[in-house]
Amino acid sequence: MSESEAEETKISTEPVDNAWAMKIPTFRQEDNPHGVVEESSFATLFPKYRERYLKEVWPLVEQCLSEHHLKAELDLMEGSMVVKTSRKTWDPYIIIKARDMIKLMARSVPFEQAKRVLQDDIGCDIIKIGNLVHKKEKFVKRRQRLIGPNGATLKSIELLTDCYVLVQGNTVSALGPYKGLQQVRDIVLETMNNVHPIYNIKALMIKRELMKDPRLANEDWSRFLPKFKNKNISKRKQPKVKKQKKEYTPFPPSQPESKVDKQLASGEYFLNQEQKQAKRNQGRTEKQKEAAKRQDERRNKDFVPPTEESAASSRKKEDGSSTKVDVKALKAKLIKANKKAKSS
């Protein structure tokens, strides 16, 4: 064993500042000289429109997997892809990586990108977004937000997360480092929950700049990140007249007076039928008199002469108006008269 290999196998007990920056120890053939005991296989189906592309690139897929001692089969009749281990396979996890590769290829990811998942530091994530939004129109609109105009939003997500992202149908396929996959998943899920992706992109850009400053390594970054308030207003129609809530009282409201209670209070309850009838007639005649009075006033209103101003008040107004003198106009007249006198 060389010195470099001995250093890699050495287990460090020191605290780790950044777990994402840790190097994953490589798994070599010497670590598993006997290979795998049982044959493992994974199969996945692909849609009809991918048949032509997969048929063209399948020799490259077989060549790529044979380097890791894996077998690949393409069944065009059933529309399936199968990967299997062989007797020479020594990496037990490479079959899982190969399964992810054929899954990505079935989701319209090109072979040049899908084969990267076989690397140790590269992973993949297939995010299902079809059941996150109930209405089809909203789903299409929010999925389009994720892509952006001319794919600009998707490109910016790829640059910030170092991941390859593909939006296809009801899924979003992501391929890249594991930290970037977490960020892509957060952005996609929040976008489908009606949070515009530009907000998360801005936050990622700020975080990238803050990571460059070692003084802020142990500080809270929430004060630097933008805070966005939800401005969704309720679409419920508000009533024109809103009822004011009455003050809370622990006692129940008093019982309303009945007709008998009112008659007892006024003394009408103890009158006989003739007296009640006489009282009703009296009330009726009083109402008729008031109505006749109002009608006479309305008729006589046309015959009431208008009020005339007295002669003394009109003279006072004339005197008041005559006492007012326009000083500016008088000055202008005097200056004009002086000019005429000088010229003559």
Swiss-Prot record:
Regions of compositional bias (Basic and acidic residues) in chain numbering: 283-302, 315-326
Family: Belongs to the KRR1 family.
Domain KH: 125-193
Subunit structure: Monomer. Component of the ribosomal small subunit (SSU) processome.
GO terms of biological process kind: rRNA processing
Gene that this polypeptide is encoded by: dbe
Chief localisation class: nucleus
Ranges where the record places region Disordered: 232-260, 273-326
Subcellular location: Nucleus, Nucleolus
Function: Required for 40S ribosome biogenesis. Involved in nucleolar processing of pre-18S ribosomal RNA and ribosome assembly. Binds to RNA. Required for female germline development, cell viability during eye development and for survival of dividing cells and epithelial cells during early wing disk development.
CDD domains documented for this protein: KH-I_KRR1_rpt1, KH-I_KRR1_rpt2
Keywords associated with the record: Coiled coil, Developmental protein, Nucleus, Ribonucleoprotein, Ribosome biogenesis, RNA-binding, rRNA processing
UniProt-recorded name of the protein: KRR1 small subunit processome component homolog
Biased composition (Basic residues): 232-245
GO molecular function list: RNA binding
Domain of life: Eukaryota
Coiled coil (residue ranges): 270-295
GO cellular component terms, A-Z: nucleolus; nucleoplasm; small-subunit processome
